Amino acid sequence: MTGTPPLCAAPDPDPRAPAFDVPAGACDCHFHIFDGPSPQVAERSYTALPAPLPAFRHLQRTLGLTRSVIVQPSVYGTDNRTTLQTCAADPAIKAVVVIDEDTPPDVLASCREQGAVGCRVNMLFGSNAQIDSLAGLAGRIADHGWHLQILGDVSALHDRMDAFAGFPVPVVFDHFGHLEAAKGVNDPGFTALLRLLGDGHAWVKLSGAYRLGPAGPDTDAAVADLAAALIAANPDQLVWGSDWPHPAIPQQEMPNDGAVLDALAGWVPDTALRHRILVRNPARLYGFDDDA
């Protein structure tokens, strides 16, 4: 990569409250912090602006969320210090870290002790991670009770998706499976994801909808169709995430996080089902006490 990777836009500093009653114990299952000891790696696809924990806390209070899952961003590589520092002192925050084949067992154990419950694999942006090699990684993290989180376009993985069914850990797909929404519910990769989800071999995050196509009603309608198909397949293995501070989203497309949460209510008008997606399912996947 030559030159400085493009600078990210800042998130909306004035999130509005959602238009529905958010249940107690609701969890944001996908956010990032850009602030702390971890340097941004040279080979990265964007340059993050500071996005500190106090700003996220303000967002949480405004949206009525009390639990959260911080996800290691690609720009920090395998330096998980900022991510772990965020969650180490707060049992209401869990972490998803990034490791590689050289990460020793004692580091994995240390990450777990600091609140890590899973690891993320980036299969986008030129990553050479392959499904065959992920089976070995899944075996390494199984002893720690972790899940494997996939950032990858399921439409590009369609002929290998069934391999995930044999993994010894839960497999979680970011951002609806990160396919272009216009490809629709009949895309072979998405139908493979639905099959995994329906059989209980996968989880899906209803997050990052604005990453799936150009802003506008056509993308909104296509995303709603994807959401409906996922809900029909298995609502008990769906979770929601804000994706705050929305890295690499242009300023003119930067969403207000109240609208991001309201989108969930549009996809899931049933109150009891929203409670499962916001409270019960995250408690089961990430190990929160399900007392809400």
Language-model segments: residues:
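Catalytic pocket-lining loop regions of alpha/beta-barrel enzymes
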Residues: G3-P5, I131-W240
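Hydrophobic faces of well-ordered beta-strands that scaffold small-molecule active sites
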Residues: C27-F31, S68-V71, K94-V97, V117-V121, ...
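Short, electropositive alpha-helical surface patch
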Residues: N80-V96, V223-I231, M254-G266
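Active-site gating/metal-coordination segments in enzymes
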Residues: T2-P11, V75-D162, K205-P217
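Alpha-helical scaffold segments that flank or form the walls of functional sites
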Residues: V41-A89
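Conserved, mostly hydrophobic/aromatic
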Residues: H30, Q60, T83, C119, ...
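Mid-to-C-terminal alpha-helical segments outside catalytic/metal-binding sites
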Residues: T2-G25, L49-R67, P235-Q237, Q251-A292
